[in-house]
Protein backbone atom coordinates (compact mmCIF):
# COMPACT_ATOMS: atom_id res chain seq x y z
CA UNK A 1 0.00 0.00 0.00
CA UNK A 2 1.33 3.44 -0.95
CA UNK A 3 2.03 6.19 1.54
CA UNK A 4 0.15 9.49 1.21
CA UNK A 5 2.84 12.17 1.06
CA UNK A 6 0.52 15.15 0.54
CA UNK A 7 -3.11 15.47 1.54
CA UNK A 8 -4.19 19.09 1.08
CA UNK A 9 -7.89 19.59 0.39
CA UNK A 10 -7.48 23.18 -0.80
CA UNK A 11 -4.77 25.82 -0.55
CA UNK A 12 -5.17 29.22 -2.20
CA UNK A 13 -2.23 31.64 -2.45
CA UNK A 14 -3.19 35.13 -3.56
CA UNK A 15 -1.43 37.43 -5.99
CA UNK A 16 1.29 39.58 -4.35
CA UNK A 17 1.15 37.37 -1.26
CA UNK A 18 4.34 36.51 0.57
CA UNK A 19 3.70 32.90 1.51
CA UNK A 20 5.94 30.87 3.81
CA UNK A 21 5.92 27.12 4.27
CA UNK A 22 7.44 25.54 7.38
CA UNK A 23 7.60 22.05 8.78
CA UNK A 24 10.03 19.44 10.01
CA UNK A 25 11.96 17.16 7.65
CA UNK A 26 9.60 14.84 5.80
CA UNK A 27 6.59 17.14 6.23
CA UNK A 28 6.07 17.34 2.45
CA UNK A 29 7.29 20.90 1.78
CA UNK A 30 9.55 20.08 -1.16
CA UNK A 31 6.99 17.61 -2.53
CA UNK A 32 4.36 20.37 -2.50
CA UNK A 33 6.68 22.76 -4.35
CA UNK A 34 7.61 20.09 -6.90
CA UNK A 35 3.93 19.36 -7.44
CA UNK A 36 3.19 23.05 -8.03
CA UNK A 37 6.02 23.11 -10.61
CA UNK A 38 4.59 20.01 -12.34
CA UNK A 39 7.75 18.03 -11.54
CA UNK A 40 5.62 15.54 -9.62
CA UNK A 41 2.11 14.57 -10.75
CA UNK A 42 -0.51 14.20 -8.00
CA UNK A 43 -2.50 10.97 -7.91
CA UNK A 44 -5.61 13.08 -7.30
CA UNK A 45 -6.40 16.77 -7.45
CA UNK A 46 -4.75 19.54 -9.44
CA UNK A 47 -2.61 22.64 -9.24
CA UNK A 48 -3.77 25.85 -10.91
CA UNK A 49 -1.79 29.04 -11.46
CA UNK A 50 -3.86 32.04 -12.54
CA UNK A 51 -6.79 29.67 -12.97
CA UNK A 52 -5.01 27.32 -15.38
CA UNK A 53 -3.99 23.74 -14.71
CA UNK A 54 -0.18 23.50 -14.69
CA UNK A 55 -0.37 20.11 -16.41
CA UNK A 56 -2.41 21.46 -19.31
CA UNK A 57 -0.29 24.46 -20.35
CA UNK A 58 3.20 25.95 -20.03
CA UNK A 59 2.14 29.60 -19.85
CA UNK A 60 2.93 29.82 -16.12
CA UNK A 61 6.59 29.02 -16.79
CA UNK A 62 7.04 32.47 -18.34
CA UNK A 63 6.16 34.30 -15.12
CA UNK A 64 7.33 31.90 -12.39
CA UNK A 65 10.96 31.73 -11.30
CA UNK A 66 12.13 28.98 -8.98
CA UNK A 67 15.09 27.38 -7.29
CA UNK A 68 14.60 24.24 -5.25
CA UNK A 69 18.02 22.58 -5.41
CA UNK A 70 21.23 22.39 -7.41
CA UNK A 71 19.57 19.99 -9.86
CA UNK A 72 18.06 23.15 -11.37
CA UNK A 73 21.57 24.32 -12.39
CA UNK A 74 23.88 23.16 -15.21
CA UNK A 75 27.04 21.83 -13.53
CA UNK A 76 29.38 21.90 -16.54
CA UNK A 77 28.91 25.66 -17.09
CA UNK A 78 30.56 28.49 -15.20
CA UNK A 79 28.15 30.86 -13.41
CA UNK A 80 28.87 33.47 -16.13
CA UNK A 81 27.92 30.99 -18.87
CA UNK A 82 24.85 29.84 -16.96
CA UNK A 83 23.54 33.36 -16.42
CA UNK A 84 24.12 34.19 -20.10
CA UNK A 85 22.24 31.00 -21.04
CA UNK A 86 19.26 31.87 -18.80
CA UNK A 87 19.46 35.49 -19.97
CA UNK A 88 19.11 34.36 -23.60
CA UNK A 89 15.96 32.44 -22.69
CA UNK A 90 14.54 35.75 -21.45
CA UNK A 91 15.90 37.77 -24.41
CA UNK A 92 18.26 39.74 -22.17
CA UNK A 93 20.32 42.45 -23.84
CA UNK A 94 23.86 43.32 -22.72
CA UNK A 95 22.33 46.17 -20.72
CA UNK A 96 19.90 43.75 -19.05
CA UNK A 97 22.79 41.47 -18.08
CA UNK A 98 24.73 44.42 -16.70
CA UNK A 99 21.83 45.54 -14.49
CA UNK A 100 21.30 41.93 -13.37
CA UNK A 101 24.92 41.62 -12.26
CA UNK A 102 24.70 44.97 -10.48
CA UNK A 103 21.58 43.89 -8.58
CA UNK A 104 23.33 40.78 -7.26
CA UNK A 105 26.82 42.21 -6.88
CA UNK A 106 26.60 42.44 -3.10
CA UNK A 107 25.23 38.91 -2.72
CA UNK A 108 27.85 37.47 -5.08
CA UNK A 109 30.55 39.13 -2.96
CA UNK A 110 33.18 38.83 -5.73
CA UNK A 111 33.05 35.02 -5.44
CA UNK A 112 30.80 34.07 -8.37
CA UNK A 113 31.40 36.08 -11.54
CA UNK A 114 34.63 35.99 -13.59
CA UNK A 115 36.18 33.19 -11.54
CA UNK A 116 36.51 30.57 -14.32
CA UNK A 117 35.05 27.97 -11.99
CA UNK A 118 32.43 25.42 -12.98
CA UNK A 119 29.13 25.39 -11.11
CA UNK A 120 29.95 21.82 -10.04
CA UNK A 121 33.01 23.16 -8.17
CA UNK A 122 31.18 25.87 -6.22
CA UNK A 123 30.55 25.67 -2.48
CA UNK A 124 27.02 24.84 -1.31
CA UNK A 125 26.51 28.48 -0.34
CA UNK A 126 27.61 29.84 -3.72
CA UNK A 127 25.44 27.27 -5.52
CA UNK A 128 22.53 28.66 -3.54
CA UNK A 129 23.39 32.23 -4.56
CA UNK A 130 23.56 31.28 -8.26
CA UNK A 131 20.20 29.51 -8.07
CA UNK A 132 18.45 32.34 -6.23
CA UNK A 133 19.81 34.96 -8.64
CA UNK A 134 18.77 32.93 -11.70
CA UNK A 135 15.24 32.58 -10.31
CA UNK A 136 14.89 36.37 -10.56
CA UNK A 137 15.88 36.51 -14.24
CA UNK A 138 13.05 37.56 -16.53
CA UNK A 139 11.38 39.56 -13.75
CA UNK A 140 8.89 36.81 -12.82
CA UNK A 141 5.64 37.64 -11.03
CA UNK A 142 6.00 34.56 -8.82
CA UNK A 143 9.18 33.30 -7.17
CA UNK A 144 9.46 29.95 -5.41
CA UNK A 145 12.48 29.18 -3.23
CA UNK A 146 13.13 26.04 -1.18
CA UNK A 147 15.35 26.69 1.87
CA UNK A 148 16.94 29.91 0.52
CA UNK A 149 18.97 30.49 3.71
CA UNK A 150 20.45 27.01 4.01
CA UNK A 151 24.27 26.79 3.65
CA UNK A 152 24.65 30.59 3.66
CA UNK A 153 26.82 32.44 6.16
CA UNK A 154 25.08 35.05 8.37
CA UNK A 155 26.05 38.00 6.12
CA UNK A 156 24.74 36.23 3.01
CA UNK A 157 21.51 35.27 4.80
CA UNK A 158 20.85 38.91 5.65
CA UNK A 159 21.66 39.95 2.07
CA UNK A 160 19.21 37.40 0.68
CA UNK A 161 16.54 38.51 3.14
CA UNK A 162 17.02 42.19 2.21
CA UNK A 163 17.01 41.34 -1.49
CA UNK A 164 13.71 39.48 -1.15
CA UNK A 165 12.13 42.31 0.84
CA UNK A 166 13.36 45.03 -1.55
CA UNK A 167 12.26 43.19 -4.68
CA UNK A 168 8.81 42.62 -3.24
CA UNK A 169 8.51 46.27 -2.24
CA UNK A 170 9.52 47.42 -5.73
CA UNK A 171 7.69 44.86 -7.87
CA UNK A 172 4.95 43.27 -5.76
CA UNK A 173 6.26 39.75 -6.31
CA UNK A 174 4.33 36.74 -5.05
CA UNK A 175 6.70 34.62 -2.96
CA UNK A 176 6.47 30.96 -2.05
CA UNK A 177 9.29 30.26 0.39
CA UNK A 178 9.95 27.15 2.42
CA UNK A 179 12.41 27.45 5.28
CA UNK A 180 13.57 25.90 8.53
CA UNK A 181 14.69 29.36 9.63
CA UNK A 182 11.68 30.67 11.53
CA UNK A 183 13.24 34.09 12.16
CA UNK A 184 13.91 34.89 8.51
CA UNK A 185 10.67 33.43 7.16
CA UNK A 186 8.56 35.47 9.59
CA UNK A 187 10.40 38.65 8.55
CA UNK A 188 9.69 38.02 4.86
CA UNK A 189 6.27 36.35 4.84
CA UNK A 190 3.00 37.75 6.13
CA UNK A 191 1.37 34.34 5.82
CA UNK A 192 2.89 31.06 6.99
CA UNK A 193 1.48 27.57 6.66
CA UNK A 194 2.68 24.76 8.92
CA UNK A 195 2.84 21.44 7.11
CA UNK A 196 3.04 18.16 9.02
CA UNK A 197 2.92 14.70 7.45
CA UNK A 198 1.59 16.22 4.24
CA UNK A 199 -1.27 18.09 5.89
CA UNK A 200 -1.85 21.76 6.67
CA UNK A 201 -1.85 22.03 10.46
CA UNK A 202 -1.97 25.81 10.82
CA UNK A 203 -2.42 28.75 8.45
CA UNK A 204 -1.11 31.90 10.14
CA UNK A 205 -1.79 35.31 8.60
CA UNK A 206 -0.53 38.75 9.51
CA UNK A 207 -0.05 38.10 13.21
CA UNK A 208 2.42 40.21 15.18
CA UNK A 209 3.15 37.12 17.26
CA UNK A 210 3.79 34.77 14.33
CA UNK A 211 7.34 33.86 15.41
CA UNK A 212 6.20 33.10 18.97
CA UNK A 213 3.33 31.00 17.63
CA UNK A 214 5.70 29.00 15.42
CA UNK A 215 8.19 28.50 18.23
CA UNK A 216 5.37 27.31 20.48
CA UNK A 217 4.22 24.82 17.83
CA UNK A 218 7.67 23.38 17.17
CA UNK A 219 9.02 23.27 20.70
CA UNK A 220 9.95 19.81 21.91
Task: For each feature predicted by the language model, list its residue ranges.
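A short, flexible loop at the N-terminus of ABC-type nucleotide-binding domains that lies
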Residues: 1-8, 15
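The feature captures the beta-strand-to-loop junction immediately N-terminal to the Walker
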Residues: 22-24
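Helix-to-loop junction immediately C-terminal to a conserved catalytic motif
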Residues: 37
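Conserved ABC transporter NBD signature motif
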Residues: 45-60
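Catalytic Walker B motif of ABC-type/P-loop ATPase nucleotide-binding domains
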Residues: 143-147
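H-loop/switch region of ABC-family ATPase nucleotide-binding domains
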Residues: 178-180
